[in-house]
């Protein structure tokens, strides 16, 4: 029983550590993506404004 409990605890710890690492990687990736999206959204706005001004 004690060995099984230890194995379960170890498995749980490994899973938790893996989840934390994955979460860190994913959150960093999401932050990078959101920054890129923000840049993409804000760069074309200036271009669109210039183009629309030229058209008018």
UniProtKB/Swiss-Prot annotation:
It comes from the Eukaryota. The chain crosses the membrane at residues 6-26. It is found in: Membrane. Keywords: Membrane, Transmembrane, Transmembrane helix. GO terms for cellular component: membrane. It is a single-pass membrane protein. Its main location: membrane. This is Putative uncharacterized protein DDB_G0280563. It comes from Dictyostelium discoideum (Social amoeba).
């Amino acid at each position: 029983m004690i060995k099984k409990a230890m194995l379960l605890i170890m498995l749980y710890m490994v899973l938790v550590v893996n989840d934390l690492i994955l979460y860190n990687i994913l959150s960093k990736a999401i932050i990078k993506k959101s920054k890129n999206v923000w840049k993409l959204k804000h760069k074309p706005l200036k271009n669109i404004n210039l183009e629309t001004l030229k058209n008018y």
